[in-house]
Amino acid sequence: MACRCLSFLLMGTFLSVSQTVLAQLDALLVFPGQVAQLSCTLSPQHVTIRDYGVSWYQQRAGSAPRYLLYYRSEEDHHRPADIPDRFSAAKDEAHNACVLTISPVQPEDDADYYCSVGYGFSP
């Protein structure tokens, strides 16, 4: 029986203001039906993720990046109608990060994922 797996390549850095940097994992391997959690970590630690909104983008091979969602808080977030609710985000303030969750992962989710941070919503 063949095993079909998905790989996620995570790229950064979109923000570099006053030596502030976003860091992401290089790669994540998951199987269809599993949960993928992709972290976007803000550093240095004196700059807190609490103060920023995070936008997430997906780029499939051979395609332009596609806006997935924006998350600042439970009260301030946005996901376009054409993006499935399998994609969600939340902040992990203990690790100064925003986490994109894909649940359950589907074969078409095989892509590169990018994050960017800012003070307001801007797809």
UniProtKB/Swiss-Prot annotation:
Domain Ig-like intervals: 21-123
The keyword Metal-binding belongs to this UniProt entry's keyword annotation: no
Tissue: Expressed in B-cell precursors. Expressed in fetal liver, bone marrow, spleen and lymph node.
GO biological process terms, semicolon-separated: immune response
Gene Ontology cellular component terms for the protein in this record: endoplasmic reticulum; extracellular region; immunoglobulin complex
Function of the protein: Associates with the Ig-mu chain to form a molecular complex that is expressed on the surface of pre-B-cells.
Stated family: Belongs to the immunoglobulin superfamily.
Protein name stated in the entry: Pre-B lymphocyte protein 3
Gene (name only): VPREB3
